[in-house]
Amino acid sequence: MTNIRKSHPLLKIINHSFIDLPTPSNISTWWNFGSLLGACLIIQILTGLFLAMHYTAYTTTAFSSVAHICRDVNYGWLIRYLHANGASMFFICLYLHVGRGLYYGSYMFTETWNIGILLLFTVMATAFMGYVLPWGQMSFWGATVITNLLSAIPYIGTTLVEWIWGGFSVDKATLTRFFAFHFSLPFIITALVLVHLLFLHETGSNNPSGIDSNSDKIPFHPYYTIKDILGLLLMLTALLILVLFSPDLLGDPDNYTPANPLNTPPHIKPEWYFLFAYAILRSIPNKLGGVLALIFSILILAIIPLLHTSKQRSMLFRPFSQCLFWILAANLLILTWIGGQPVEHPYITIGQLASISYFSILLIIMPLTSIMENKLLKWRVLVV
């Protein structure tokens, strides 16, 4: 008799995706982040669902409803902080997942990569709208500043901003629609994740060497299920330490003050995971130029496959490209730091230099370095 997991219409799909899936035998811990992102998404949807049961999307009660969740709801404080810090964990895994894709050349699976970029944009939009919901000072002013950027679009900008606001300022209508979108977008993200996996399983996983591994595959279960469970336990440990010992570490103190349209905070900034893009936005004096740079700082990932000039897929055997990759990583950390600093000297200059470095490394220096490595490899072969 055939095993039910191989014959049942539904179980067969799960079997081909998570049990009998042929997987390269040499994939490292950097390949764990896909499953961790799935776990983060489940945590966010479940905690978000319970928060939505007690939250009220109305300007006069939103702030107090969040306080009510933390004070009066059983384990409400735990659910709220798991959701807030779960978002931070989500973005840590997301950025490491993208970084692994860049390092090992996973972007050569263009369909999977492009769906991944779409997922990144959707998750960022969801997180931004979620940050507005507690209706604290930083929620209100963050929403005002970021949505106001759309007014830089020629001709239709102002009308578009007022359409998104549902009035002439961020108010009741804005909060209601942001809650509606924040609630519904995770389900769209889940659908996109399934499409992402569908395209990935068409080609099979990449591996650290970047070469074809069809001759050396092992089943996903039990080898990688055990490995993923270990990664999940480590991530949950880190998340629980953050939630139980310093839940407000990554938040902004201003958000514990109810939103006041008449009082502007001294320094408006988004959550830490958007600071690198915010620093790029602020480094350009022109409003439209800043908005375009902000969008392109993420959209640049879409043209990475076109800029791949190396004869090798992975950076594993390309020391110069490796150096550039880690310089880029350090540069992003500098941009994140600058995004959280006030707009004054020397932070403005550092931000501008880091922004120029970010784009020039990805667009110019990396492709040229790859060409140079091809030449060096050719010369080495000739010498031998």
Swiss-Prot record:
Pfam families documented for this protein: Cytochrom_B_C, Cytochrome_B
Entry binding sites for heme b b566: 97, 196
GO cellular component: mitochondrial inner membrane; respiratory chain complex III
Cofactors that this protein relies on: heme b
Localization in the cell: Mitochondrion inner membrane
UniProt-annotated binding residues for a ubiquinone: 201
Cofactor note: Binds 2 heme b groups non-covalently.
UniProtKB keywords: Electron transport, Heme, Iron, Membrane, Metal-binding, Mitochondrion, Mitochondrion inner membrane, Respiratory chain, Transmembrane, Transmembrane helix, Transport, Ubiquinone
Record InterPro entries: Cyt_b/b6_C (IPR005798), Cyt_b/b6_C_sf (IPR036150), Cyt_b/b6_N (IPR005797), Cytb/b6-like_sf (IPR027387), Cytochrome_b (IPR030689), Cytochrome_b_C_euk/bac (IPR048260), Cytochrome_b_N_euk/bac (IPR048259), Di-haem_cyt_TM (IPR016174)
A single GO molecular function term of this UniProt record: metal ion binding
Annotated membrane topology: Multi-pass membrane protein
Record-linked SUPFAM superfamilies: a domain/subunit of cytochrome bc1 complex (Ubiquinol-cytochrome c reductase) (SSF81648), Transmembrane di-heme cytochromes (SSF81342)
Residues spanning the membrane: 33-53, 77-98, 113-133, 178-198, 226-246, 288-308, 320-340, 347-367
GO BP annotations listed: mitochondrial electron transport, ubiquinol to cytochrome c
Domain of life per record: Eukaryota
Keyword Transmembrane helix among record annotations: yes
UniProt: heme b b562 binding residues: 83, 182
PANTHER family on file: CYTOCHROME B
Family classification: Belongs to the cytochrome b family.
Assembly and binders: The cytochrome bc1 complex contains 11 subunits: 3 respiratory subunits (MT-CYB, CYC1 and UQCRFS1), 2 core proteins (UQCRC1 and UQCRC2) and 6 low-molecular weight proteins (UQCRH/QCR6, UQCRB/QCR7, UQCRQ/QCR8, UQCR10/QCR9, UQCR11/QCR10 and a cleavage product of UQCRFS1). This cytochrome bc1 complex then forms a dimer.
Further details from the record: Heme 1 (or BL or b562) is low-potential and absorbs at about 562 nm, and heme 2 (or BH or b566) is high-potential and absorbs at about 566 nm.
Task performed by this protein: Component of the ubiquinol-cytochrome c reductase complex (complex III or cytochrome b-c1 complex) that is part of the mitochondrial respiratory chain. The b-c1 complex mediates electron transfer from ubiquinol to cytochrome c. Contributes to the generation of a proton gradient across the mitochondrial membrane that is then used for ATP synthesis.
UniProt-recorded name of the protein: Cytochrome b
Organism of derivation: Hystrix africaeaustralis (Cape porcupine)
